[in-house]
Amino acid sequence: MDKARKLELIKKFGRSEGDTGSPEVQVALLTERIQSLTEHLKVHKKDHHSRRGLLMMVGQRRGLLNYLSDQDIERYRTLIKELGLRR
């Protein structure tokens, strides 16, 4: 993920200008990294080190999504719809 794509995601999902810490932004950035790493692992099937990193990122995203669903269910539903996440 390059700097321009990262800024684009922050602008789209941030609650204000320069908002990088909100759960929505963190989940969006993690989702982008997860998708990129998933494509990498389709080609490099034996890269177990990266696979572990992927699983850790998925767990971190799951925790942020759980937090967001507890805090504000509407923001949670909007986010998973925009990102195309299941559940």
Curated annotation (Swiss-Prot):
SMART domains to which the protein is assigned, alphabetical: Ribosomal_S15
Single GO MF descriptor: structural constituent of ribosome
Gene Ontology BP annotations: translation
Lipoprotein as UniProt keyword: no
InterPro entries assigned to the protein according to its UniProt record, in alphabetical order: Ribosomal_uS15, Ribosomal_uS15_bac-type, uS15_NS1_RNA-bd_sf
The keyword Ribonucleoprotein appears for this protein: yes
Keywords from the UniProt entry: Ribonucleoprotein, Ribosomal protein, RNA-binding, rRNA-binding
Classification via CDD domains: Ribosomal_S15p_S13e
Superkingdom of source: Bacteria
Role: One of the primary rRNA binding proteins, it binds directly to 16S rRNA where it helps nucleate assembly of the platform of the 30S subunit by binding and bridging several RNA helices of the 16S rRNA. Forms an intersubunit bridge (bridge B4) with the 23S rRNA of the 50S subunit in the ribosome.
HAMAP family (alphabetical): Ribosomal_uS15_B
Quaternary state and interactors: Part of the 30S ribosomal subunit. Forms a bridge to the 50S subunit in the 70S ribosome, contacting the 23S rRNA.
UniProt-recorded name of the protein: Small ribosomal subunit protein uS15
Native species: Clostridium beijerinckii (strain ATCC 51743 / NCIMB 8052) (Clostridium acetobutylicum)
Gene: rpsO
